[in-house]
């Protein structure tokens, strides 16, 4: 089965072709980071307009690179939600328009399911069941995954997501956009003993997260500086911030594995690319005797490959999941634990 995947939920336009026999045939991605940089964040209207400009050239690129004819695809999977409404509509319109033109069925995919399954694209994918930490700019969730569509929520953020805390704290330190990579790079030069920031909900009796207080703590430290913050102070604060986030995420993952008795941990989402987090989880895995799986770095960010793959997995379970129904039906808000209804 050959599936075309289309991702357009936020500020990356991604297209990919995935074949259940041959694997990932081609994928192409365009990031709008440079365009949004001057605004300090994603501008939804600009994002939507840029998806329109990029989608068709990227579509032609993946067909050209794969050597596959347009009519050879069996289905089209697109990100149906959650995400920015206008951005989602662009991907949906491309999918439905192409499906109508080629007489191919289409299937809406949950963006977070795409992230959740992206580590399965690796050469040594994890087996079910496993614990998944989904950690990105908009979401921080711990889930038990027993199979495709079999997701049990164990814990989630009660306020800011980890990635959101990264971006906002980076802005407080004047590190620019995107904040996550910037604050992580700065943290590498920081003194881990210079500042001590709180570890929100580290010792709570559940698996939920809360990062708004950590962001506020960074703001307090910045405001308490009597002079302009020098680069070393920024690095020290960044280090304290990253250490706090990483410690909480690692501890919650270890607790989830202990409570469920599982020995496999999957990390998905953009924050999963953070080197400090990977080092911490790898150390915990060696100490606690579990195995941790990550997506390839190129698949940590939003991408079309994960959508094509998720679509292919869905269709293997239920070949009738894709329909020749070309009405747009995007879901800007869409809880992950409801997608088994697809």
Curated annotation (Swiss-Prot):
Q: Which Pfam families match?
A: TsaD
Q: Where does it localize? A: Cytoplasm
Q: Where does the chain cross the membrane? A: none
Q: Which reaction does it catalyse?
A: L-threonylcarbamoyladenylate + adenosine(37) in tRNA = N(6)-L-threonylcarbamoyladenosine(37) in tRNA + AMP + H(+)
Molecular functions per Gene Ontology: iron ion binding; N(6)-L-threonylcarbamoyladenine synthase activity
Record-listed Fe cation binding positions = 111, 115, 302
Q: Which UniProt keywords apply?
A: Acyltransferase, Cytoplasm, Iron, Metal-binding, Transferase, tRNA processing
Function statement:
Required for the formation of a threonylcarbamoyl group on adenosine at position 37 (t(6)A37) in tRNAs that read codons beginning with adenine. Is involved in the transfer of the threonylcarbamoyl moiety of threonylcarbamoyl-AMP (TC-AMP) to the N6 group of A37, together with TsaE and TsaB. TsaD likely plays a direct catalytic role in this reaction.
Full protein name: tRNA N6-adenosine threonylcarbamoyltransferase
Give the originating organism. Herminiimonas arsenicoxydans
Q: What is the lineage of its organism?
A: Bacteria, Pseudomonadati, Pseudomonadota, Betaproteobacteria, Burkholderiales
Encoding gene, per UniProt annotation: tsaD
